[in-house]
Design a protein with these regions (language model features):
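Acidic/histidine-rich catalytic cores of soluble enzymes
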Residues: 29, 130-237
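Conserved, mostly hydrophobic/aromatic
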Residues: 21, 67, 85, 96, ...
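C-terminal helical cap(s) of enzyme catalytic domains, especially alpha/beta-barrels
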Residues: 269-281
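Active-site acidic/histidine proton-transfer and metal-coordination neighborhood
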Residues: 58, 74-180
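Charged helix-capping and loop-helix junction motifs
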Residues: 45-50, 82, 86-89, 120-124, ...
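Acidic (Asp/Glu)-rich catalytic clusters
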Residues: 19-25, 45-65, 90-100, 131-137, ...
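N-terminal pre-domain/capping segments
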Residues: 1-68, 72, 76-94
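Active-site beta-loop-alpha junctions enriched in small/polar residues
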Residues: 7-11, 34-36, 68-71, 109-111, ...
């Protein structure tokens, strides 16, 4: 069974996330843990969270994917912004305990002129420090693959692997069970990975460098840009440079097909319903 959903609004509460997923034929979804541009978070309604968990359990949902706010930059040159990112992440882990076994993905950040090596070191430090505070959690932290826009880190599989390895060195080997990767099809395409002509080769490269055992979710997006543009502009499924055929193959690939697939395409609900129907055929 295809595990698919899309990025939903939390305007109708946590139960509303589950109800919306059921309404559109989804069995997973993504949501922002807090205001994506500002960082403010609503208080968790425990009863509301319990209702969501009941929906998920009764309908055999795949793991859901919480998304950290865009304002989080763990490798900023500003120590205050790095601390802000760390405290937001720690708070998000506490909030996500109300939705057990969630996945929590974040953008590894932009080094803002310090250089990729410094950025990678700073982000790995934050991950280590977060888990020194978050002692026990059922939530897994996922580093998202990035397109390489501006000074973003995580633009290559090698950079993502460096972040993981450094974080483990700083925290200890037990971090391995808490940390993974979320692969974004638009981002890796814009980053130069040709999944249209060489999907198997890209998957093999990911496995060789990072390990498919560390891949826990996929953001399924088409791209407005040609291969290697480093721009990160999502497009509707089948309307961009990646195309429906390739994205359909991604969802059916034997090494990927059991993962949760999250649509982040520029759509209203009706568009997501249509994309889910297309991909389920």
């Amino acid at each position: 069974m295809l595990n698919i959903g899309y990025h939903e609004s939390t305007a109708n509460g946590l139960e509303g996330l589950g109800l919306e997923a059921l309404e559109v034929g989804a069995n997973t979804f993504a949501f922002f843990t807090r205001n994506p541009r500002g960082g403010k978070a609503k208080d968790i309604d425990e009863v509301d969270a319990q209702k969501l968990c009941k929906i998920m359990e009764e309908n055999n949902f795949a793991p859901v994917v919480a998304h950290a706010p865009y304002t989080m930059n763990p490798c900023s040159a500003d120590p205050g912004l790095r601390e802000y990112a760390k405290q937001m992440m720690i708070d998000d882990f506490a909030r996500l305990e109300y939705i057990p076994n969630s996945l929590y993905n974040f953008h590894p950040g932009s080094h803002t002129g310090q250089g990729s090596d410094v950025g990678i070191d700073l982000t790995s430090t934050m991950i280590s420090e977060v888990f020194k505070t978050v002692k026990n959690t059922s939530t897994k932290l996922l580093i998202e693959t990035m397109a390489g826009k501006g000074s973003e880190i995580g633009r290559t599989f090698e950079e993502v692997k460096q972040i993981i390895d450094l974080a483990e060195q700083k925290f200890g080997s037990s971090l391995k069970s808490r940390l993974g990767v979320c692969l974004d099809t638009c981002h890796i395409w814009d980053g130069g990975y040709d999944i249209v002509s060489n999907l198997d080769g890209v998957i093999e490269e990911f496995d060789k460098i990072i390990g498919l055992e560390n891949l826990y979710a996929i953001h399924l997006n088409d791209s407005m840009n040609p291969l290697g543009a480093h721009k990160d502009r999502h497009e509707k499924i089948g309307k961009g440079h990646i195309g429906f055929e390739t994205l359909y193959k991604v969802t059916r690939h034997p090494k990927l097909c059991n993962l949760p697939f999250i649509l982040e395409t520029p759509n209203e609900q009706s568009g997501y319903i249509e994309e889910i129907k297309m991909l389920k055929k």
